[in-house]
Amino acid sequence: MNFFCFAIVFLLLVNNYRLQNYEIIINYFVPLHKIMTIIAVVLGYFALLFAFSRWTGRRATNETFYRADRQSPWYMVAFGMVGASISGITFVSVPGMVLTSQMNYLQTCMGFILGYVVVAFVLLPLYYKLNLTSIYAYLGQRLGQRSHKTGSWFFLLSKMTGAAVRFYVVCIILQRFVFEPLGVPFALTTVLLVLLIWLYTRKGGIKTLVWTDSLQTLCLFTALLIIIYKVATDLNMTMGEAISAVSGHELSRVFVWDDWVSKQNFWKQFLSGVFIVLVMTGVDQDMMQKNLTCKTLRGAQKDMCTYGVAFLPANLLFLSLGVLLVMWYQQHGLTLPASGDELLPGYVEQTSSIFHLTSCLFVLGIVAASFSSADSALTSLTTIYCVDILGQKDNEQLRKRTHLGMCAVFVLFILFFKVVNSTSLIDAIYIICGYTYGPLLGLFAYGLLTKRVVNDRLVPYIAVASPLLCYAIDYGVGQMTGYRFGYELLMLNGLITFAGLYLSSKGQDD
């Protein structure tokens, strides 16, 4: 019922804008026909999401919303987590990475695998042993109440900001390909999309997401594979010929061993990949919440190792698409985009006037990737605020109000980011991650690697000072040597936090 009500309102809005933009319809009938085809595909996709929501939301309680009653099949969690972790940023930005760094990103993906193994066999056993709903409750038990609150607030800031960056992708893509020609303002586009998320997650929460993420992952990779096939066909290649062309292309270089200064050096990329997973998965409530819904610890470990390994071939597909797109641009005598983020959208714009399928698949892939990230982020933010900040895990009415409030704040963050963003989307995510996730890494590392009692009163100040000091070091080194920290910013930030905690607890032991 929710879906059909929304569909009626949506179509009325579209009809209203069509009436207001009568001249646009007359002059651009074919583009609008394409737009309506995209809208039909997206509405059909959301009809499936709402069907899953209706099924999983029956007799849902707070325990269902937060932990899916600890009954999720591990293989469904693993499959869904691939799509949830990839996001719309990957769909747009990773193919374009070949323009500036070839296939060097696969070095980071190799580090991801080791990172997931560490999380599966070090952190997951701890979380299951303590039977946690929120992983930041560990900080309260090990370090103290202020440490608990500090970790929770840093996650709220980090996740809200990072998720807004990711969801910004789907908003600008749909605005560009669908809503802008109809005269719909960006703000309304954003509100409509976030409203959809709220509607299909408001009852079942994380239980709904385990199943909808699997559907979204399936749609994402179906769209990706068909687009790859479409580009190869445009190049008059069979799939075998396309594979050979990609593997022999100058942009297919993976490893950088010889340049220690370069940000693309193998060991910098590999170690950054390990720490990115430790932070963005191991101490991230959003990523861990689904893993904590598995029936057993062994099931959770199997799911994490499975999707950890899957990241390498998944990103290889995206990068291979990037190489094929470069070949397509060159074959058609077109200038390559100045920004890698425009590589795939540019291809879609060039071909979608002839093939509606291209634009439909592109939008479907973007929507599937971005919604699987945003919906789980909003669920985890609601969980943290209710369970950790307010300490009212069982208050169902509070949880419902908080979920709606988080959606409203999410919209504001997206609109703010649209105004201030001026960097590559994929780099923006890791810049934000480096400055806001670093203290989380330091807090968990201190709790796990030492037995010393922290000075809990000073923890909030240390956590705030660490990113500021990290930024000062990055700026100072850049001014003096020209070197800028890359993904290793995570490690530096975590190390500064760890050192601050250690010095503040000098002479105190458990």
Model-derived segments and spans:
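Short, Lys/Arg-enriched N-terminal segments with co-localized hydrophobic residues
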Residues: 20-35
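Membrane-embedded helix-loop-helix hairpins and adjacent transmembrane boundary segments
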Residues: 31-510
